[in-house]
């Protein structure tokens, strides 16, 4: 049982969908210790609890570049088939334990070639771990669906190659494409040819935008990359002007980009704790109650809630939802809405979506 409840219901027992969850940000500290020992990696702590605390402390910098440096350690232990397989398997098992029924694992294969793996071998190792975990969950009477989001690093020059990699594995685990890494100064349009290739192949893309940069980056992701979802997307709130606010109501004016994102129901992959750690919401404040996620949700944007990097943020999807219940007095209806939003944004077939949506509705109804 978790410590997070909504309307008397343990949030961990609710069916959940996780769209923005990085493989190299979801390792168990004990696994890092063991895999690190195998390769002689020097670590900042020698026990799991202390190592987990170190990651959390390092991640509370308020700077996205500093936050990203913690991945030097996690990716170091994910350079072999064995390491990738184990991390992927445990990643899925941890999602299932948290009540996730559909999850997408995003990761950048080009970051995992230091010990001789090929791009294809890396993707295959992750898929093998995913499938083993799905089988283990099923053997215990559970069910979880998982897809890979194959990411390219936006500041490097392998996006065309990674796009082709994603297409090669589209029927073997890969469900979408993403670009990650430092956002400011590296717009999606820099990788235009990769997105053109994907669009011509009818392969969906989500793009990190509205995290480390503002609305220009979001616009570029939508128009140049044809993004169906925005990784974070939080800073779309920069295009919303609050004209009047009382205890009973709030009057706002949406800019053209915000209107487009709302009217087209572009999925926002909001990650509350991560946004605090990286300074994404600094212009609005430094507390979770300052986060524009509630405003976006109340205005009818397609908000989803995600953990981003469970290790760095010391979090789970249950915790992220629970924090919003505490900060904004969200109820079961709010949690069901953002969960259904996530199901609608999932990179799965329409038939799979309908099944997923029914499972979510039934799961919430059973707990009311």
Which residues make up each language-model segment?
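Metal-cofactor-binding active-site regions of metalloenzymes
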Residues: 1-203, 211-229, 235-368
């Amino acid at each position: 049982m978790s410590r997070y409840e909504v309307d008397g219901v343990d949030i961990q027992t609710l069916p959940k969908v996780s769209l923005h969850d990085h493989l190299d940000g979801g390792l168990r500290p004990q696994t890092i210790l063991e895999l690190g020992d195998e390769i002689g990696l020097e670590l900042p702590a020698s026990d799991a609890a202390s190592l987990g605390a170190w990651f959390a402390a390092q991640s509370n910098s308020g700077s996205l570049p500093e936050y990203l440096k913690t991945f030097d350690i996690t990716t170091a232990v994910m350079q072999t088939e064995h390491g990738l397989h184990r991390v992927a398997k445990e990643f899925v098992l941890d999602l299932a334990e948290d009540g996730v029924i559909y999850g997408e694992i995003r990761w950048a294969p080009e970051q995992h070639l230091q010990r001789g793996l090929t791009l294809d071998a890396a993707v295959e190792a992750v898929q093998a771990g995913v499938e083993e975990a799905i089988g283990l969950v099923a053997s215990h009477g559970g069910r979880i669906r998982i897809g890979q989001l194959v990411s390219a690093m936006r500041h490097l020059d392998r996006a065309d190659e990674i796009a082709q990699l994603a297409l090669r594995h589209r029927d073997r685990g890969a469900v979408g494409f993403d670009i990650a890494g430092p956002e400011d100064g590296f717009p999606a349009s820099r990788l235009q040819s990769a997105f053109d290739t994907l669009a011509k192949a009818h392969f969906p893309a989500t793009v990190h935008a509205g995290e480390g940069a503002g609305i220009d980056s979001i616009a570029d992701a939508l128009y140049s990359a044809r993004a169906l979802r925005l990784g974070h997307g939080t800073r779309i709130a920069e295009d919303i002007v609050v004209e009047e606010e009382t205890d009973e109501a709030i009057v706002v004016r949406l800019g053209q980009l915000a209107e487009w994102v709302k009217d087209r129901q572009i999925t926002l992959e909001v990650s509350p704790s991560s946004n605090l750690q990286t300074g994404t919401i600094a212009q609005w404040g430094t507390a979770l109650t300052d986060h524009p996620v509630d405003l976006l949700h109340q205005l009818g944007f397609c908000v989803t809630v995600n953990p981003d990097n469970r290790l760095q943020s010391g979090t789970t999807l249950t915790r992220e939802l629970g924090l919003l219940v505490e900060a904004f007095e969200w109820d079961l209806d709010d949690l069901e809405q953002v969960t259904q939003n996530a199901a609608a944004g999932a990179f799965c077939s329409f038939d799979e979506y309908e099944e997923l949506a029914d499972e979510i509705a039934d799961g919430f109804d059973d707990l009311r």
